[in-house]
Amino acid sequence: MPEIKLTHVTKRWGKFYAVDDLSLDMEDNSFITLLGPSGCGKTTTLRMIAGLETPTSGQIKIGDRVVFDSEAGINVPANKRKVGFLFQNYALWPNMTVYQNISFGLGNIKEELPVIDEEAKALKSMIKALENPGELVKLIEECRDKKGKLDLDMVYLKLIDNYTISIYTAKELYNYKLHEAADKESAAKQKKQELTAKLDSILAGHKEKREELNEKFEVVSGGKVVTRVRKYSKEEIDLAVRRVSRIVKIGMFMNRYPAELSGGQQQRVAIARTLAPEPQVLFMDEPLSNLDAKLRLEMRYELQRLHVETGSTFVYVTHDQMEAMTLATKICLINNGVLQQYEAPLTVYSRPNNLFVADFVGNPSINFIEAKGVQNENGSLDVTILDGRKAKFVPKEHLDLQRWFAERDKNEADEAARHKEKMQDKKAVEKSNKDE
């Protein structure tokens, strides 16, 4: 999965800066949380990376591809960035079933794709299933109700999940009625021979055209996979829907409507729909905010599992520091559009960059005590606090206050000089929402 790189990205409306000169490197296969108070610019940052918001200036790269560059005039549309976006309200179509919600976006994709021999692929799957007729019959028989009647929806679901096949292949496999045969072994053997002969005929046809099929049943000619601009077939769409439904465990809800699902189930459907096109990056904008406390905790574990299983890069917006601390490999803490700290959760917690970070992260909040004093030669500090009380502070690590003050003053002077130089540009706009 790709790395995401933001370079001097700014978004402003008039004199109001939603995001101010943000530079970030998000490593591949990372779980990044954008954390901060309401209105700090985290959702705007997410939307700019996804292509739903146009930055005022800067550059954004996803992998090796520049998707936005203000100077070069590049702005790749959102639907061409190969990213998935999970909205806060899930955005499920109420008039569509779960299956239709997940498959809807797949039907609109048209791009250069490998040519796949789907018939050969389905035949190979059925031949493999028929190699163990006892297991196949057992799967079907397990789907009988108390009256002995087969639940066909359950039969198809078991066949789909057990053999990783589409609904169309599952129906064809069931229609062989192997479970009704007197001699199941002989019936399976005969059907397997028929399917093998058919598969051999297809492979021979490819050979005549000087083609072959690879392990994914893609057509290979001259050592290269044959591609063409096309849409996904019904078989491919169904396989994709079934794949993501297994990941988020919603296979049994395919025929239900969103109104018939709980909040957690609706979220799983939204996640499945986002994962179906196999996006390079997955963006989530406070997806747990509508759930109750217990369900939020459960879904955090689900998101961690998904991150490990999919290997995707996750970028997650939240103002809940507990979510950020438990989910993230790195926390990007923003305030008033300005990056405050970008490090691992424990580093942000134990070594805050400034007073804002120290105050924002942690529950209960940290206590700030104003103190005046001097530093001794051994590094300890004699201080006066709380209306004249004397105290001695011994730092855990070596602390040179004089050096710290000198560096602070230098950084402030450098920042003031950079700002002055920036404001000399005729295109520069003074920030109305001043930093604290």
Language-model features, listed with the residues they occupy:
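Conserved ABC transporter NBD signature motif
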Residues: G58-S70, E119-K124, K128-E131
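ABC ATPase NBD coupling module
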Residues: V67-G84, N108-E111, V115-D117, I127, ...
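Short coil-to-helix segment of the ABC ATPase nucleotide-binding domain corresponding to the Q-loop/switch region
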Residues: M96-G105, K110, P114-D117, K121
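The feature captures the beta-strand-to-loop junction immediately N-terminal to the Walker
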Residues: L35-P37
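Helix-to-loop junction immediately C-terminal to a conserved catalytic motif
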Residues: A50
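ABC ATPase nucleotide-binding domains
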Residues: Q100-F104, N108, T227-F356
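Internal alpha/beta loop-helix hairpins
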Residues: V308, T313, T318-K426
